[in-house]
Amino acid sequence: MLYYLLQYINELFDPPGFGVIEYITFRASAAAITSLLITILAGPKLIGYLKSKYIEPVKEEAPPEHRQKRKELPTMGGTLIIFSVVVSGLLWAKFNDPYVWLILLSILWMGTIGFIDDYRKVVLKIKGGLSAKYKLIGQVSLGLFIGFYTRFDPAFSVLLTETTIPFFKDLMIDYGWWYIPVVVFIITAVSNAVNLTDGLDGLAAGTSGIVVFGLGGFAYLTGNAVYSEYLNIAFIPGGGEVAVVSMAIVMACVGFLWFNSHPAEIFMGDTGSLALGSAIAVIALLIKKELLLPVLAGTFLLETLSVSLQVTWFKFTKWRFGEGRRIFLMAPLHHHYQMKGWAEEKIVIRFWIITLLFFLASLMTLKLR
């Protein structure tokens, strides 16, 4: 919106300095600042409203100390993240870029699924909220839409069903008709992974912010013909606009941490975690970096694997020995360390550090090929 207004003023009057609106870096920075300010300024009012309406029920399987600390805190804070990102994205990104719309759509789509889940748990007092079946339907539906749209719309003709492989130079893989199932799988897997990670104050917001920052950097490089040629990575015309929305997401997460850092005043709930997870997946798919996610988003992978291993081992040992046994004290992984007596703040910061290391490892793929 502001992009087109400032562009019109620049073409009409040619005032000094207005040409900067054409630069991705300027608009990404502006979107970041706008998103941060919206989150911080709107946060207190939203928290006050949610405190009077929506208090998150604590999971019964959570550690006792964790349950005690989390009583009487509002959820659905993800609405703040979504609002900040959508407003900032619409203000500073180009309307005619389909990449922008698909990212914003995915955030709103999965944010709505998460909101319904939170609403059923908090307001309707339905234990478990939205059933796993309907969550899966929502995730698969989004995946099918994104898959078919990017597969058959001419705007996405570059590479189409091909993608790059990390650590290998000039090596591409063509999904062919497997492309759409791959899109569905990645969106479902990543949104669930972020949802599993959202269990401690600041954990999901911090790790998501780091991952999206990395994706935003890759988006900027893939959308720049000079940088992409120099680094020998896929060039995607118009993909640079993804960086604008990415920075809005990053700073929405940072702004949310203002209220969600320990001791938290609000939780993002499934509204936020599912929205962030879908955004990460869609951004990675659009810039052809989905195969880099196991490295860049390694923290989410570890959290998901801890749950999968725990459940699988428990079922196997129950079948084999007559009683279920556990690998971890509790899953996901962050609760394992909680049960070991680690302070919540220490777990969160260490997971942030691990995510930063994964981010640096992903940067190394630009040269280690």
Curated annotation (Swiss-Prot):
Gene Ontology terms for molecular function: metal ion binding; phospho-N-acetylmuramoyl-pentapeptide-transferase activity; UDP-N-acetylmuramoyl-L-alanyl-D-glutamyl-meso-2,6-diaminopimelyl-D-alanyl-D-alanine:undecaprenyl-phosphate transferase activity
Keyword terms, alphabetized: Cell cycle, Cell division, Cell inner membrane, Cell membrane, Cell shape, Cell wall biogenesis/degradation, Magnesium, Membrane, Metal-binding, Peptidoglycan synthesis, Transferase, Transmembrane, Transmembrane helix
PROSITE patterns for this protein: MRAY_2
Membrane topology field: Multi-pass membrane protein
Keyword 4Fe-4S: no
Pathway noted in the entry: Cell wall biogenesis; peptidoglycan biosynthesis
Pfam family for this entry, one: Glycos_transf_4
TM region positions: 30-50, 73-93, 99-119, 140-160, 171-191, 202-222, 239-259, 266-286, 291-311, 346-366
Catalytic activity: UDP-N-acetyl-alpha-D-muramoyl-L-alanyl-gamma-D-glutamyl-meso-2,6-diaminopimeloyl-D-alanyl-D-alanine + di-trans,octa-cis-undecaprenyl phosphate = di-trans,octa-cis-undecaprenyl diphospho-N-acetyl-alpha-D-muramoyl-L-alanyl-D-glutamyl-meso-2,6-diaminopimeloyl-D-alanyl-D-alanine + UMP
The keyword Transmembrane is assigned to this record: yes
EC number: 2.7.8.13
GO annotation (BP), single: cell division
Predominant subcellular localization, coarse grouping: membrane
Location in or out of the cell: Cell inner membrane
CC cofactor: Mg(2+)
Stored InterPro entries: Glycosyl_transferase_4, PNAcMuramoyl-5peptid_Trfase, PNAcMuramoyl-5peptid_Trfase_CS
Protein's job: Catalyzes the initial step of the lipid cycle reactions in the biosynthesis of the cell wall peptidoglycan: transfers peptidoglycan precursor phospho-MurNAc-pentapeptide from UDP-MurNAc-pentapeptide onto the lipid carrier undecaprenyl phosphate, yielding undecaprenyl-pyrophosphoryl-MurNAc-pentapeptide, known as lipid I.
HAMAP family, sorted: MraY
PANTHER family: PHOSPHO-N-ACETYLMURAMOYL-PENTAPEPTIDE-TRANSFERASE, PHOSPHO-N-ACETYLMURAMOYL-PENTAPEPTIDE-TRANSFERASE HOMOLOG
Protein name: Phospho-N-acetylmuramoyl-pentapeptide-transferase
Annotated organism of origin: Chlorobium phaeobacteroides (strain BS1)
